[in-house]
Regions:
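A residue-level marker of the well-folded mature domains of exported/periplasmic proteins
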Residues: 1-175
């Protein structure tokens, strides 16, 4: 089970825990890691164990083709949640994910609406290579490249950790 990264994540995990219970006829197995290779290995082990479903919130968007193909070949339903994976749509049953690119676009539009003379941005990202990191970053980078008064002064990952994000901001303020 992942740590509480957001209210959305907390709610969806709570819902999964309420639905996928022994009382409802499920034997739930969970695995959490921010490392894609560890997630891939765990998913492959779950396939070997003969699970009926894989519910995946991927650390990274890539590297999942072979595992999801294996799941499909073994009749295992795959559901993506929270984050998208860059694979053929036929390899998963459904995706209940956020539109990360739209979130990035909305953030950029909000910043533009401030009508500042200069934008000196501390860009704190999630796990590198994740759908959230890529989708939210691309609109910002496009705007920075298009406007002379937009500058990213620091761009670092906090890997979904609020304390790390605060440390990054404090170090920029104190420098």
């Amino acid at each position: 089970i992942p740590p509480s990264e957001s209210g959305y994540r907390e709610a969806i995990v709570k819902d999964f825990e309420a639905v996928f219970t022994a009382e409802n006829g499920y034997e739930a197995k969970t695995f959490y890691s921010l490392k894609n290779d560890e997630q891939l290995a765990a998913a492959q082990q779950f396939i070997t164990d003969g699970v009926d479903y894989l519910l995946i919130s991927a650390a990274e968007t890539t590297g999942w083709d072979a595992v999801l193909q294996s799941a499909q070949e073994n009749g295992i339903g795959v559901f993506l949640f929270d984050r998208m994976i860059a694979v053929d749509e036929s390899l998963y049953t459904a995706a209940v994910v956020s539109d990360m690119a739209n979130q990035g676009k909305l953030a950029v539009e909000w910043l533009k609406g401030l009508n500042l003379e200069a934008y000196n941005i501390i860009h704190i990202q999630g796990a590198m290579g994740s759908d959230a990191q890529i989708g939210r970053t691309d609109p910002l980078v496009a705007q920075v490249n298009a406007a002379d008064n937009w500058k990213i002064v620091v761009q670092q990952t906090a890997t979904w950790d609020e304390a790390t994000a605060k440390q990054i901001v404090e170090s920029v303020i104190n420098s």
